[in-house]
């Protein structure tokens, strides 16, 4: 088979019953607690710790698991304003040119190419309104291809959760 080894593994993985039931159970456990010990996952799943390690590593290799880490309250770091910004582009196709410029702005934590009234929707954190104005006026709106922005300030973060994972017991 031609192509990258990763692609070959991904196709092989997809040919399995999408994601095996045990893998789904592992995902459910580690998505709820990324710090859980492999031995505890193994106990809950009724398999060896080595099996858990191998399955997690395989899911990482196949980009089923794309990251792990800790969630830190942005306010503790001095970022008090959470903002969603609708960005309009000259042409939607400019998305690929604009994204690398947005990646240079560390306060931007998410970027989505969207349907609807905006070409893109970005989420960023600013220290305060003055900092937000600097980011908008001196950085985002200066990117070639950006024709306009609309800013929505989040007043409260109400829901934060992981997606549900279904599996057979």
Predicted features by range, described:
Residues 1-169:
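A compositional/biophysical signature of low hydrophobicity enriched in polar/charged and small residues
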């Amino acid at each position: 088979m031609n192509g990258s080894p990763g692609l070959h593994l991904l196709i092989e993985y997809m040919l399995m019953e999408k994601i095996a039931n045990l893998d789904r159970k592992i995902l459910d456990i580690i998505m709820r607690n990324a710090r859980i010990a492999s031995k505890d996952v193994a106990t809950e799943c009724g398999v060896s710790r080595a099996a858990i390690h191998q399955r997690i590593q395989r899911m990482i290799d196949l980009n089923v698991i794309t990251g792990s880490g800790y969630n830190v309250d942005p306010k503790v770091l001095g970022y008090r304003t959470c903002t969603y910004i609708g960005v309009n582009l000259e042409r939607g196709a400019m998305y690929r040119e604009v994204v690398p410029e947005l990646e240079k702005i560390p306060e931007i934590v998410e970027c989505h190419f969207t349907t609807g009234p905006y070409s893109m929707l970005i989420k960023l954190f600013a220290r305060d309104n003055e900092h937000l104005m600097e980011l908008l006026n001196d950085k985002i709106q200066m990117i070639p291809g950006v024709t306009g922005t609309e800013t929505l300030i989040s007043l409260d973060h109400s829901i934060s959760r992981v997606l549900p994972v279904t599996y057979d017991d």
